[in-house]
Amino acid sequence: MPNYPDSIQDLEPLSGLYIRKRFLNEVRTFLDQKHPQGWCIVAIDIENFKLFNDWYGQDSGDYLLLEIAAYLRNLHQEDNYITGHFSADDFFICMPDDGHKLRHIYAIIYHYIDKLEQDDSFLPSIGVYRIEDESLNVSTMCNNAQIAASSVVGKIGNRI
């Protein structure tokens, strides 16, 4: 379990990351109290994840999700990023808008997938929404990050 001093009901059972409601509340509190500059919401999705489960089995899919979740818990614990797992393969991070760190996150998740299979049909898609208006609804920020992630689906080059 993560080192979150939180109620178990606020954590997604498989991953141990914040559920949607708690993630949205934590980000809202953070924005209201800290007024950070240069931060973003990141949406992470695994392209064709349902097909991954069909081909390799749900145990392999769960293992992949657990690997990603452990990495994101580490980001929470070491870097104080806010991390969440909304459903299936939908993960979110509130973090500084740092292209180098985003590429590193992509590389780590790509490595986890590559360990399990050798087909480029299952690639991480990462969408970034730069927080420029703190008053915007956090759910809308997450939706915008998901839209950005969906815009790279099917592309081979830049997937962030």
What spans do the regions from the language model cover?
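Short beta-strand-to-loop capping motifs
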Residues: I93-D97, R130-D133
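Short amphipathic alpha-helices in soluble, non-transmembrane regions
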Residues: I105-Y112
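Conserved catalytic/ATP-binding subdomain
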Residues: K21, L136-S139
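Conserved acidic
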Residues: M1, D45-N48
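Catalytic/regulatory signature loops of cyclic-dinucleotide turnover enzymes
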Residues: E117-L123, T140-I160
